[in-house]
């Protein structure tokens, strides 16, 4: 019987520990926090979006960070396996918009309880408040880890599942990346992924709190004509810039050392010609009104003063005096408001980290290190990341399962 130490008790670490124990290993799970799954507890706004019901083959379209590396993991331990894992314990799940799967209770604590119960059932020794402060090598293998700078724990095999560097208050402080580098692994550039964006346009703060639905955004690098990212959905203005599902997904394509613009199409369902006809119809209806009072049926009230300002049409101009050229400019504006990106919000605010242990140095079919023979990795510590929708938690569980299966 091997002794296995798993570092980090997020979903990846817990699944790795459960699976390693089922494979007849003596397993210790070390967690720096005072409880299991601290970051998992806040995912999905505390409801825990645990996976997605889309066909597993579709998952890769939602994984911008090294999707090919995850083929073995996601096909070995699928979303169906995740659903069966929890439902076999009596934890009911439900699917919502976009295929996102949540516990029926809407409580992330149920998901953590399910994992915790399996840890107990499989006799995993869980050590909370146990922060790994050093890893010791001997003859090219890990011999032991130091815990809380106080004592050493020896084992035959080790799994690092410490997460990235986003949400540091949950314990994701990058310790596992530091240890991995010490062990000879390359750490790819760390960037925030799924994070709000700060905008230079001063008027944005006047729209703070406004949510725009059914819009289209396109993100451009100023050096490239083709958009880096384009999608439709929901967006939120904040005091510093923009957020919401569309922006979080789009942030994956932005770095802090480039020049980017975000174009907003407020009416993606209408062509320029169709929008022009719609505006003419409204102008005919409000023929004797001032321009500022003619857009109520077309745009959110809070947005109208900004559109008027950007259109350079006098707010007091009668709509029957607005000429064709002005109307054309208004159409182009509504179909293409340009936001100038200042920077991404800090990595601490990101939902996940882009970057991590280089996937070229990990066997994708086992999660084993190609450098250290008694080491595997699982979860966000690896250079993989996905969009929101349950994909990141599924990746954590799938890589954890592979790592635990191959100790």
Identify the meaning behind each predicted range.
Residues 127-129, 134, 305-385:
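A glycine-rich dinucleotide-binding beta-alpha-beta segment and adjacent secondary-structure elements
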Residues 47-95:
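Glycine-rich active-site loop/strand segments that organize a redox cofactor
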Residues 5-7, 30, 132, 152-168, ...:
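Short hydrophobic core segments
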Residues 76-157:
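Feature captures the FAD/FMN-dependent oxidoreductase FAD-binding
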Residues 21-45:
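Glycine-rich FAD pyrophosphate-binding loop
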Residues 34-36, 41-42, 50, 56-57, ...:
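An anion/pyrophosphate-binding glycine-rich loop and adjacent beta-alpha core
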């Amino acid at each position: 019987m091997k002794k296995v130490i798993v570092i980090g008790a997020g979903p990846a670490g817990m699944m790795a520990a459960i699976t390693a124990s089922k494979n007849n290993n003596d397993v210790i799970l070390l967690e720096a926090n005072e409880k299991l799954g601290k970051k998992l507890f806040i995912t999905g706004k505390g409801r825990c979006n645990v996976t997605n019901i889309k066909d597993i083959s579709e998952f890769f379209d939602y994984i911008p960070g090294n999707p090919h590396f995850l083929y073995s993991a996601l096909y070995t331990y699928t979303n169906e396996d995740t659903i069966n894992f929890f439902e076999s314990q009596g934890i009911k799940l439900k699917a919502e918009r976009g295929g996102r799967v949540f516990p029926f209770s809407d409580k992330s604590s149920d998901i953590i309880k399910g994992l915790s119960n399996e840890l107990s059932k499989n006799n995993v020794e869980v050590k909370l408040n146990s922060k790994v402060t050093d890893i010791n090598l001997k003859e090219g293998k890990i011999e032991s880890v130091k815990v809380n700078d106080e004592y050493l724990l020896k084992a035959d095999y080790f799994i690092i599942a410490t997460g990235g560097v986003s949400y540091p208050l949950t314990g994701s402080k990058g310790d596992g990346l530091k240890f991995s580098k010490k062990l000879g692994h390359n750490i790819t550039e760390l960037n925030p992924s799924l994070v709000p964006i700060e905008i230079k346009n001063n008027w944005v703060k006047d729209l703070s709190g406004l949510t725009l639905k059914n819009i289209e955004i396109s993100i451009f690098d100023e050096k490239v004509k083709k958009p880096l990212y384009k999608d439709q959905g929901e967006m939120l203005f904040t005091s510093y810039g923009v957020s919401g599902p569309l922006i979080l997904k789009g942030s994956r394509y932005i770095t802090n050392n480039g020049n980017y613009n975000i174009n907003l199409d407020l009416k993606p369902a209408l062509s320029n010609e169709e929008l022009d006809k719609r505006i003419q119809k409204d102008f005919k209806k409000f023929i004797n009104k001032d321009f500022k009072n003619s857009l109520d049926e077309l745009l959110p009230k809070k947005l109208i003063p900004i559109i008027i300002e950007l259109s350079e049409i006098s707010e007091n101009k009668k709509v029957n005096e607005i000429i064709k050229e002005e109307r054309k400019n208004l159409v182009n504006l509504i179909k293409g408001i340009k936001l100038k990106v200042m920077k991404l919000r800090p990595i601490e605010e990101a939902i996940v980290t882009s970057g991590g242990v280089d996937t070229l140095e990990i066997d994708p079919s086992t999660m084993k290190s190609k450098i250290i023979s008694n080491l595997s990795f699982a979860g966000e510590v690896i250079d993989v990341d996905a969009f929101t929708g349950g994909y990141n938690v599924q990746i954590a569980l799938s890589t954890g399962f592979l790592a635990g299966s191959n100790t």
